[in-house]
Structure formats: structure tokens, C-alpha cells
Amino acid sequence: MLTLGEDQIGRIGASSSWSRSKKLRVHRYEIPDLNVEPSLDWDGEETGEATKALSSTCLKPKDADYCLLNVPQLVYELEVEILARVPRFEYWKLKLLNKGFSRLLKSDEIFKVRRERGVVEPSVFMLSSGDTCWTMFDKGFGNCQKLPELPSDICFLHGDKESLCAGTHLIVTGKEEKSIALWRYELETSKWFKGPAMITPRILFASATCGTVVFVAGGLKIEGNGTMEVVDSVEKYDSKTKTWTLLRGMHKRRKFCSGCYLRGKFYVLGGRDENGQNLTCGESYDEKTNTWELIPDILKDMSFSSVQSPPLIAVVGDDLYSLETSANELRVYDANANSWKKLGDVPVRAKSNGGWGVAFKSLGDKLLVIGASAGPSRAETMSVYTSRPSANPANKLYWEESKRCCGVRFNHFILNCCVMIA
């Protein structure tokens, strides 16, 4: 049996007496429900208008004269600055934390700050043969996300389409049963919307992106009675206002042409005229002076065939690159000599279908090429390669294969591909 000495009993009694004389104050804290609707007037979630709301809270005790930690609230401006620096492929996780974050990430405020702070990153939007939904990849092709199905008719779904990006908008145009249609996917809301239509709806045109705007030129206009016309008209889309503006027309009508934005100007290269003749000339548009300058014979060394795709061109830094499909090789343009320098073979089979089914784009400071691998004994699945020209001053490019591709196998024939910087 355990017995206590008198000295131990005394200590216990003293302790008990002390506890009776001192009242222990126990505070209860309310744990906030982060999914409770804020008591603010949110002005139109679907319109993408940013609403200032504090999603962070401070734990406060019921006893008003006491504060345990005095945790400061995270102010709205700081929230935006932090979220703007988070990789975009992590945003879906943040949207699950609470409704405040979800609403903020669905606004355009985050992407506006990303542009202002220079923390934008490229994403690749792609549609391969056999797919009914577009896929978005991060720049390393380690993460991907399926977009919602585009709610168009069956003619649009299975027909030829053009794709371009402006700001956070992915724009896809094509022919529906009765007319040429334009659909846009908004990155903030992850939803498809129809329109706004171009001033002159068209297909098979040239396009180039500059930040939040995109230029389109030339192409094929289809009348209501089915007649087709090659056009020389030019338009600019502003993703901030969701409007099209008519610009000065080109010197020549052209379809199956390609565009790029280089050194502050919109370039349109190649294509076919209204008589179906291949064009070796190009044109550059200076928006400041609203003028077009003809560039004779810029594609004079290019080979043409009856099944030739539009020129495969991409801009990295201040250099213009071309994938010459007939030779399956990469070239860089020398503006002073108006000629192209050969840089070596590309690791995909661009020659097989005259350039169709191959994506050739700029991805930040890298060149990106997607298609069927040119290597022997390769399965007919999509291969992705990148090369950084600045890392090879001797103009000897080295291609690095992205072998992950999210662990998903895609068809090697690429129907549409464009890069969004946001």
C-alpha cells in the first residue's frame, strides 16, 4: 500500500489551496468556417470583376478583454501579390480552400498583377487527332489539364480550325453548319463562351499574339451562299475589352499564310493568293504608323507542294525561325541578307504530311516542336522536344525530349496548338 509522509501531504494541501484561490480562466475560441459566404456584395462572378474581400481571419476569443496571439489579418493586396506568384497549375488547389480564394482566382485581378510583376508563364494548349477536348500543358509538360468540352455543333468539332491566344483567352475559329463561328475559353473561369465574332469572319488566316491582344490577317471568307473569297483585311482582338478593331489591309490577298510578332511589328508570311498561286513575299505591319511594308522573296528558298501547310515559323528573342518541312530542318532568318541560315535537322517527321500535324512554336526562350518522332522504331505517339537557341551561340541546336507528358499517350498528329503567356 502506498503511504504519504506528512511533508508530502503538506505540499499537496498547499497546492490545492493555491488552486482554489486562483481562478483558472479558460477561453473558448471560435474556429471560422472558411466556406461561409462573405457578407459583401460580390459584383458578378461570371463577368470576372475583381472584388476586394479579406479571406483570412483572426481567431478571436469570446472574452473581449483578452487576445491570445493578436494575429494580423492578411490584407487583400498582399493576398493578390502572393497568389500571383504561385504557379498557375496550383490554382485549382487554392480554389478548394475557400470561396474567397475561388472568387479571387476567377477574377482577372490575379493575371493583371502577374503581367505587371513579370511573373507570367507559358502554357501550351493542344488538340490532337482523335481528341474531343483540348488539353493544357505547363511549360515542362509535367502537368496537364483537360479543358471542358467545347459546346459547338458536329461540323465545328470535326472540321478544320484555327487557334490563337490573347491574354488569358484561347480563341478557336472554324466552320459550323451555317457560318464561321468563334469560341473563346477564359482561363479565369475555365469556361467556353461564344464570340465575339470577327468583323470579317474567316478561316485559314495568319495570326500573332502580343500580350493581351492578337492580330489576324488574310484568310478565306465564306459567304452565306457558300462562295469563298480570299481577303486582305486585318483585325486586332483585345482580350481586355473583348472587342475586334479593323486595321489597315495588307498589300496582297492571301490564305494559308502564317504570322508572328517580331521587334514590335506584325509579320505575315507566304500563303496563296486569290488565284491559288504560292506567295514567296511577306509583309510587316507597324501599328504606330498604321502602314504595311512589303518584303519581297522572304520565302524564295522554300519548297512548295500541293499539300503544303502554311509556313511553320516561331520567334524566340529577336530571331525568326522556320521549320522547312521539305528538308525536315530548322532555319533562322537573317534580315540584313533577306536569307535563311540552316541550323540542322529537327527531331520530328515534318516532311511526311507536308508540315500538317506538326506544331512548331516559341515557348518562352525555347523553341517547341511536337509531332511524330523522327527516330527509328518509335511508336506512333506524340513526341515533344524543346531547344534553347541562346544556349548554343555556335548555332548548333540541341533538342531535349520531354519524356513525361503527364504519363498520357497522345496521338502524334497535332490538329491545333498555341501558347498562352499568362
UniProtKB/Swiss-Prot annotation:
Which SUPFAM superfamilies does this chain map to?
A: Kelch motif
Instruction: Identify the stretches annotated as Kelch repeats.
Output: 162-212, 213-264, 266-312, 314-361, 366-412
Query: Per the database record, which ranges form the F-box domain?
Result: 68-114
InterPro entries referenced in this protein's UniProt entry, alphabetically? F-box/Kelch-repeat (IPR052439), Kelch-typ_b-propeller (IPR015915), Kelch_1 (IPR006652)
One Pfam assignment = Kelch_1
Q: Which GO terms describe its cellular component?
A: nucleus
Establish whether keyword Cell inner membrane is in the entry: no
Q: Which PANTHER family match?
A: F-BOX DOMAIN-CONTAINING PROTEIN (PTHR46122:SF5), GALACTOSE OXIDASE/KELCH REPEAT PROTEIN-RELATED (PTHR46122)
Query: Under what name is this protein listed?
Result: F-box/kelch-repeat protein At3g27150
- Source organism (scientific name): Arabidopsis thaliana
